[in-house]
Amino acid sequence: MPKTKLTSPPFKILKCTECDACINVPSILQSNEQAECPRCHHLLASGTRWSLHRCAMIALSILILMPFSLNYPLLSLHLLGIKIDASIWDGIWKMAVGGYEYTAFMIFICAVVMPITFALLVIMLWLAKIFQIKPRSVLLFLGYIKAWVMFDVYLVALGVTIFKVREYATLEINIYLIPFIFTALLTTLLFIKLNLSALWQEFYPECTSVYTKQAVELCPACHYTFTQKSIHYDHQQKICCPRCQSPLNTSDKLKLQATWATLIAGIIMLFPANLLPISGIYLTGALSEDTLISGVISFVKSGSYFVAFVVFFASIFVPISKIFIMLYLLACVHFKWQHSIKWQMRLLHLVHFVGRWSMLDLFVLALMMSLVTRGEIINFTVGPGAFYFGAAVFCTMLSTSQFDSKLIWKIYDREK
């Protein structure tokens, strides 16, 4: 008697991570297909993905190129007949030993630790597949660190530094800039092609899909859609996800408290960041200090209008705009303002996208520290405002990540 072939239903249920809607999605997507939420247009699933083996080879290439990108000079400055080299690591080290260890630590996390960790995690996934290990923590951590990998921001900071240093001496671009550019491009490519949802399903095939809209739950950590019957309990009898074991009972009040706490901390830090000098240059013994806004003005006076715009946008406009947007969205939640829901979601997506670019100014400071340090003739120093600026960027990024977009949609659904 021939065996009957079991086939899965043509459609499964996915719960949107942005608006909480339950959507029918094809069980199998072709390589050129993707599924979007019809209500908020958030990407639910994509058939586009590279094999884990290919992603691991790219991650391995990143790790091979990383020593050349971090340790070797990207730029060289010719000053008074002396050649001064600038590398990422050299700038961070000089900043740390110069008394600005907290600012250096923030740059070290975003420019060194997170890119290396990202590549290592992808390779760990590949090894986990070979040795048939369930890499729950690796998959969770990959989802958390993507916003903190800032090699592309450092690449733009390099361009800003070139325009800033050319006022003082002749600048030379070294051949090691090529592996740095390739590292930034490969990291960005890996971001695009790494499909975390597909990897979760690949490593945890026993976590089956849902085919009914009755009593459906969503894990905020691994984005797994499951029925209430599948809910697990940890050793403390708290509700957790059956796939990643993350807690599910976090109340809306706690989410708002975390968002408010980090946002208020960011607002407090932004005042000294804008009022105190962020950098200073000693020229023949005379100190010339710059705040964020005076640095932009100096670029305008020198005729570097595009660079002035980039620095103004990343260092002044973006941090302040992020705070006003987050205050507006939080006010919408607390006072139940039902404005244009799509406009509110666009603002939230904009904050998520541009927030990391505020680190541009700190990366420029690190490069300047490694280039312009020549004793009594010319010397560059980091100002006290640099730490507060970095802390403000970190706090506002944490605030954005803590904010749950479903809180806005709940107002919209309640009014309907």
Curated annotation (Swiss-Prot):
What GO terms in the biological process aspect are recorded for it? membrane organization
Its annotated compartments are: Cell inner membrane
What is a single cellular component term in the Gene Ontology annotation? Answer: plasma membrane
Do you know which InterPro entries this protein is assigned to? Answer: PqiA-like (IPR007498), PqiA-like_proteobact (IPR005219), PqiA-PqiB_transport (IPR051800)
Which residue spans traverse the membrane? 62-82, 107-127, 138-158, 172-192, 263-283, 306-326, 347-367, 377-397
Give the record's keywords alphabetically: Cell inner membrane, Cell membrane, Membrane, Transmembrane, Transmembrane helix
Cleaved signal peptide residues: none
Q: How does it sit in the membrane?
A: Multi-pass membrane protein
Q: Which domain of life is it from?
A: Bacteria
Q: Which Pfam families does the UniProt entry name for this protein? A: PqiA (PF04403)
- Which family, according to UniProt? Belongs to the PqiA family.
Protein name per its UniProtKB record: Probable intermembrane transport protein HI_1671
Q: Which organism is it from?
A: Haemophilus influenzae (strain ATCC 51907 / DSM 11121 / KW20 / Rd)
